[in-house]
Design a protein with these regions (language model features):
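Aromatic-rich, lipid-facing transmembrane alpha helices and their immediate juxtamembrane interface loops
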Residues: 2-150
Length: 150
């Protein structure tokens, strides 16, 4: 019996890293970006200590981006604004879902209940641009084996 070839072609310079290892890379990258983001937010308050923060709970949430690698392989030829929008919507969904799960044990490290453009306490619509860009970064990051080929 002859096996049918996959319809998604993997390019030569593309992801071969095992999923668990990529999960670790995505978790670390997510932590780093969150620490940088929260550090730069301190500048708005004129606090030049630039103290960045994150939560241990965020590591597995960020790590789950590794599971998007098959999607990135399929969508990488689509129009860039369409891809970015799709990725932002997926991140909004992941943020909502992980927020709901962590909320059950009162462990959610973020609270948007006082923010202007929020959907419930877990999603901020004004983060759309952040998630659009983060999704495009993750596409490149996961398809290039995380930190190994970045």
């Amino acid at each position: 019996m002859k096996m049918k070839k996959s319809t998604v072609k993997i390019q030569k310079n593309e992801a071969s890293m095992p999923l668990f290892k990529l999960f670790l890379h995505c978790g670390i990258a997510g932590w780093c970006f969150e620490i940088l983001y929260t550090s730069f937010k301190m500048l708005q308050r004129r606090d030049f200590r630039l103290t960045g923060t994150t939560s241990l709970w965020m590591f597995p949430i960020y790590g789950c981006a590794a599971f998007l690698r098959p999607l990135f392989r399929v969508t990488r030829k689509l129009w860039l604004p369409l891809r970015g929008t799709l990725y932002a919507l997926i991140i909004f969904f992941a943020e909502f879902l992980s927020g709901k799960i962590l909320d059950k044990k009162e462990l959610v490290p973020w609270d948007y209940s006082r923010c202007r453009f929020r959907v419930g306490p877990h999603i901020r619509l004004d983060f759309f641009t952040n998630w659009f860009l983060a999704g495009l970064f993750l596409e490149k990051f996961t398809l290039k084996d995380g930190f190994r080929k970045l």
